[in-house]
Each structure stands twice: as C-alpha cells, then as structure tokens.
Amino acid sequence: MRMKKFAWTLLALLALCLPALAGAEETSLVISEAMSRNPAIWQLDYQDYIEFYNAGDTALELSDYTLCRGDNLEKKCCLPARTVQPGEYAVLLCDGSEITFSLPKEGCRLTLLCGEETANTLTLPALQKGEVWTRENGVSMQPSPGYANTDEGGAQWYQSTQRALAFSEALSCNVSTMRQEYEYYDMLELCNTSGGKLQLSDFYLTDDLAEPLKWQLPAREINPGAYYTVFASGLGGKQANFKLSASGETVYIFRADGTIVDAMRIPALRGDESYGVWRGLYYYYEKSTFGKDNGAGARGVSAAPQMSLETGLYNQPIAVSLSGEGTIYYTTDGSRPTLKSKKYDGTAIAISDTTAVRAMCVKDDYLASDVTTRSYLYGMEKYELPLLLITGKYDDLLGGNGIYKNYKNRRQEAAINLTLVDEGQMAFSVDCGVKIHGNSSRERPKKSFQIRFRSKYGASTFTYPLFEHAGVDTFHSLILRSGSEDQNRSFFRDEFLGSLTRETMPNVLYLDYKPVNLFVDGKYYGIYYIRERTDTTYVSQHLGGDDEQVDIINSWQDLEQGSMGDWSRLNTFCLRKDLTDPANYNEVLSQISLDGFIDYYIARAYSGDRDYCNIRVCRSRAGDNRWYIVNFDLDWGFTIAKTPLVSMLGKVSNTSSLNNVIITGLLKNQDFRAQFLSRMALHLSTTFDTQRVLSRLDEMVAEVAHDMPYNQDRWGYSMEKWQEYVQLLRDFVQDDQGTRVMEMMQDAQRLFSLSNDEMTAIFGEMWTNGR
C-alpha cells in the first residue's frame, strides 16, 4: 500500500514538472528569424533585425520578455510594449530603439527570458551579408520578416512591396556568357514588374548607397513584363560604371529624387553561375537565363564534403572516408570531380602511395559544392623545405596538350588545386589557375609558373600569411620561380639581392619569397621560390588606393596595366628639358619616388646586373601618385665586375632604352648628384657592407642546401657546379683583389671625376681604408 501511494505521489510530481520542462524546449514566444548583416532590405532601413513568433494560442506582451546576448547574458534588452497575437510575427530592429544591442557578424548566443525563466535560446551562426537564419530552414538567402519562414512566406514578403522596376538576375563572374565588345562583363537583368510602360532613364543603378544616382539607365522604353540587360563593365556610357564582385555585391535601383525602387544582395558566385528572383523567391542558376523567365533554380550551394584524414606525410597504408550531404563524387587521378566521376558508396578509399583525393557533394535542389582536395604523401620525409603541391588533370598540365609542353602559349591556363604542406601539416588548400611564366626562361627545361586566383576557380583573391617580410597577406596572383635563367648556376641571385635591400631600401618595391619543393601531379619538380607578383593588387596594397587606380609598365615601354601616358611624357620631359633648371628638376621630383630611384640604381650597379635595361615601374594614382621601381629579374646580377656605375648609367653601348633617361638626366643636376653620392655612401656602409652581404649569402645557401641535391638530380645539374657558382658570388663580393664596395667607389670617382679629397669627404673611412 505504501509503494502504491509513493508511485501516485511521484506521478503527480512529474505531471507538475512536465509543463516546465516542455516550456524550456517549446515556448509560446520563440525567436524565428534573424539577420546580422542587412545590406539590401530597405523596408527595414538596412537594419539588422530579430523576428519573434507567438506559437501559442493566447496573446503575448513583448514587454514581459528580456532578450540577452552572450553566453553569460552580458547584454540585456527589455523588449518594447507590443501585443503579439497567436500565430503572429513581430519584427524588432537592432537599431538601438527596439533592441539596444547589435548582432555581431561572427554570431552569438541569444537568450529570451520571461521574468527570471529562460523562454527560448538560440545560437546564431556567423552570417555573410544578406544571409538570414530562420528557425525552420537554418541559413539561407531567403528573408521573410513578418511572414512565415516558408517558401510561401518568403514570396509573400517579397510581393508585399511593389517594385516598378526590379532586379531579375545577376551574373558576377562571367566566364563565357554573352560576350560584349570582345569581353565578358558582369551582367544585371532588370524586369518591368509594373502594369505599364516605363522609361528606363527615370531610374539609376548603383553599388554604393552613398552614391544613389551613380549610373543613369539609357533613354529607352520597356514594356510590362519585359527584360533589360545591363553590362556592368565599369566603363560607363551605355554600360554601368561599376563592376560586380564575384565574392558578393549589393545593387540598388533609385529614382532621380532618391526614392529607392529595389535592392538585391548577390551572394558569392562561381564561373557563369547566376542569381535571381522567380515568383518572389531567390534562386541560384548553374547557367544564366538572361532575356527570359528565370524559372525555379537551385535553393543554394551544397556544402563541401569532409575527409577523415588530412593532407600530410604517411608511411603506412591508410583508408580515407568521405562524408557530406547528398551524393559524393570523387577522383584519385588529380582531376576535378564531375557528375560523371565515381560515386562514393561509403567504402573507405584505400591508399598506399602518393595520391590526391578530390571530392564534391551534390544535394537535391542545390548546386554542386566546391571541391575538397586532400593529398596523402609517401616517401617525402627526406625533404626539409615545405612541400607545394599542384594537383590537376594530367592532360591539362603535363600531357601533349598541357601547359608544360605548350609553353609558348602565354594564354593557356589550367585549373588546379594548390596545397602547401609545412612541417608535415597542411597550411592551405586553394583552387586556382596556373600557366607558364617568363620570357626567354620558358624555353628552359625547368619552367616557372604563374598562379592566378580567379572567380571561375573559386575566390578571386587568396589570403594567407605566406611571406615573412611582405607586410600583406592577400594576393591576386603569385609566381613560382624556377631559378629562371639562373637555374643552372647559383639559383637564387634574384632573391639574394632582394633580401639585401628589403630592410634598408623601403622605397624600392621588393617581391618577397618563400622556398619550397614543388610537386606537379605527384612528380617532383625541384626547388622553387614562391614569389609576390607585381599585379594591381600588389601595387594597391603597397602604395594605396584600389586596383582600378594602378599603372604598371614593364621594360621597353610595355604597358601591363592602366595608362602609360604620364610615364612617356615624363621620359620625354627628361630627354628634352634641362634638369639643371630648378623648375624642371622639381617637376621631375614631384613625379617619382626620389629615394626609390636613387636606391634602385645603386643596388643594380652593386649587383653588376648586365640586364639593367629590364626594369618595371608602377604607381597608384590614389596614393602619392609617384612612380616607383620594382626590384625584379636579377638573374644576370653579379656578373659585371668592372665599371658597374658606368655600365648602368649610360656611358657604354646598349643603353638606348628610355629606361636610363630619367636617371642620367637627373645626374646632370648638382643637387641630385650630391644626394646620389650621399645615399651611395650610406648603402655601401650598411646595405652592402661586405660582412653583411657575405652573412646573408650564407643564410641563402643554408636555406636550400639540404634539398639542393634532389633539385640538381631532377634536372641533371651537378652539386659541384652549384657550389662553384656560389663561390663565384662570394668572390664577387670579396676576393684577393679587394671588395665590391671598393670597386663601386672607384667607379664613382671615374664617372663623376672626383678628387681623392672629394671621395674622402663623401665616403670617409671606407675610402681611406680601401675597403
């Protein structure tokens, strides 16, 4: 009897507790939607927001609740007085008036309190611009503030605002869709969703809310339901004067009076993919549908698969398992997986030799995922330098039609995965493009490569702290230098001189480097230097401004980027004008980095580079608008032992290039000559101090010495010859005849006709002590 009474008492207590337990999981008021980075919902004044839903059967007062942010409820906000009926939604803005704290883009924990009790909790994930979290669907690009978190609710929200002219579709990475004037430009499609004709010139497009009338549409009528395609080339005129970023962009339509008509957040898109609206819902399209009804597309992009083992060094057979949503397709030959590749059936992949596994997921109603690449390396413990792996389709890389055999084709590029393994661990893995790099060096057996980060492969830039001294970690392109024309000699002349000047010549642009062992589709290709490349991103990062405001000019007046008009005019000015005239002299100084020009020619002369006419200059028009010289292509350095300054500054033959005009013109000016000699004395005592140079040379040798035998064996070069060429570098710096520093001073005396007293005044003890 006592046991029966105890059982009934326990049941009664459980009955009392169950509602409280249920309330912790399913409360009447729940957080149903949230956006932490709102760039496009103008109806909410572009504010972040949180939506609450009354899931109960009685009305609720928001003022009974407190919203908290943080694991320890650090931020608290009493919700405003508002009645929420059963089945109704309430949208509150995180603008300081309704919710007093913001939603961090990296995500946060939200807790809803009713009195002292927890009513609802949510871990809001990190969101990209325009992404929304909903209780039913997780993260997507389909907002529905104030409406059900369903397709029907999303369409109702979109259609609740009348858009006379609406964005219909966008393509931000145009690889092969609808060429215009021999170029593939970004594209936007507009649709007349009003009931009558519209005059397009009444509307403006922009990618910047601070400039709502950035580009006026052309004068043209558009019928109801008709489409109009805009090419976002950045050129202006009949084409939009802005471009679209493949990593994500927000675009807006305004009327002349500043009234907004429509806005659309375009997510990150891959090559030829588009993003658009159909019947009030947002879709991704594998192929664009410009000029016609979009139809239903994909609801998103599949998440990339996971692999059970990471890239690394292995010495025993392994089994690699794949996991992910949807169907997984994979390859083991280096090629990129497609829908025709092998399907993963759940059986682990057996691996006992160097192999790259590449896989992608395809979920129903979603686009294929990005490709996951992992490389499993055998027999590579012997290498000391980091390992850089190029993985791709054999035919595209090393086959008869690949880039290596067709090295004369400067445009041919192959899609690859680039992976760096450092100290046995994967440092990064990125999809990108590769092509052969160089001029005459591409004829050599060991070729240099150019790495290009493009939207059609993945991201258009690559961010990683790759270099120790560069000061930047975002790249649009990189070079894999083979040693170029120095590959069968000392191998690192170019890197050596750059390493000497990087700290002491800050106004000479320096290309940082990192030595690695390169493997192409599992085959050893020797020691390479990963190098910065002088592209628009490099210049804008080092000199300021953006990529559109950069000019880059190669040797022999070859324009690479921007405009060369100002550079040509400067050379002509120096050729025709008397630079001893202070006005003319100051005009030149206003256009160049003075210390940079002086230091560059001192460094080049010290190195005895016989290819001295091959220079590269650049500037940022948004920076100081001055021309800077880049320290590059020094494979023929340390070869002219005598008369280095005379050879460099135009007193011998083979100096007909305009590249010498500025420096030789400036040296006619006594003030400039004095500054040139002063800086020469400074650098001979610091940058090119004999012991400093020899110590740096020892460091360069030690860095590659362990792995150099493998490089030499791969390309048929001997270690004995390499060591001989390294010794020649040492002898160049100092031998039994004296030092390079002394040769430089003696040549300066000859070139400028200086007396011994003048030399002593300029160079001090370096001259008097004969060192």
Model-derived features: where do they sit?
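Short, compositionally stereotyped local motifs that mark structural "simplifiers"
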Residues: 30, 92, 139-166, 170-173, ...
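Beta-strand signatures of extracellular beta-sandwich domains
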Residues: 66-68, 111, 204-206, 250-252, ...
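A structural motif detector for short, solvent-exposed N-terminal "entry" segments of globular domains
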Residues: 23-70, 102-105, 123-128, 147-209, ...
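Middle-to-C-terminal accessory/interaction subdomains
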Residues: 274, 289-298, 386-387, 395-400, ...
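Intrinsically disordered, low-complexity Pro/Gly/Ser/Thr-rich segments with frequent PxxP/GP/PP motifs
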Residues: 74-99, 212-237
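Conserved beta-structured recognition patch
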Residues: 100-152, 239-290, 430-442
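Conserved ATP-binding subdomain of kinase catalytic cores across diverse folds
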Residues: 390, 397, 407-562
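Gram-positive cell-envelope targeting signals
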Residues: 1-24
